Amino acid sequence: MMHIDSHQHFWKYDAREYGWIDESMKSLRRDFMPEHLESELKRNGFDGCIAVQARQTLEETRWLLELAGRHAFIKGVVGWVDLRSPELRLQLESFGRNPKLVGIRHIVQSEPDHRFLMRPEFLRGIATLEEFNLTYDILIYTRHLPVVSEFVARFDRQRSRIDLPD
C-alpha cells in the first residue's frame, strides 16, 4: 500500500503573493520546495505527496505540474482554474490532460458570499470539471457546511474532498 501526504504546498515565499500567511503562521514565511520535503517524507514512511495550489492562478497550476514532472515523489497536483470563466474548458484543455493533474481547488473560504458554491456560473464550472474526471477540493470554513451539503447533492458523480482548516 502506498502512503501519500495528500496536501502539500510548495512556494517561493513572497509576502505580496501569500498575504494570507499572517503573523500567527510566521514559520511559513520561507521557501518550501520539493528538495525540502522529499527526505522528510522518506524518513517518515511516505511514498509521495499531492501538491496543492496556494495561489489562484493558472501560472501556479502550470508551475506545480512542472515540479511534478521533475520530482517523481509528487504523485499528483490539485491546481486552480477559474471555474466561473466562459473559457474554463480551454483552461482545462491547456493542461493537455496531464495525468498528474488530479484535482482543482477554489479558495471558497475567502469568498464574501457564503453561498458562493451555489452561484450558477460556479455550478456550470463544476459540471465541466466532472467531464474531465478531476476531483474538486472544497476549501471552506465550518459555517459553509450547510451549503456544501446542498452543493454535493447536485453533483452525485463528482468526486469531492473537503478541506476544513477550522
Language-model features: where?
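An N-terminally biased module of ancient metal coordination in phosphate/nucleic-acid-related enzymes
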Residues: 1-68
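Non-cysteine beta-strand/loop elements that form the S-adenosyl-L-methionine
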Residues: 5-9, 101-108, 160-166
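Conserved, mostly hydrophobic/aromatic
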Residues: 7, 49, 64, 77, ...
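Active-site mouth loops of central-metabolism enzymes
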Residues: 22-30, 52, 78-84, 110-117
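Short, acidic/polar
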Residues: 31-41, 59-62, 85-96, 118-122
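Catalytic beta/alpha-barrel core
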Residues: 54, 80-82, 105-108, 118, ...
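Catalytic pocket-lining loop regions of alpha/beta-barrel enzymes
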Residues: 116-166
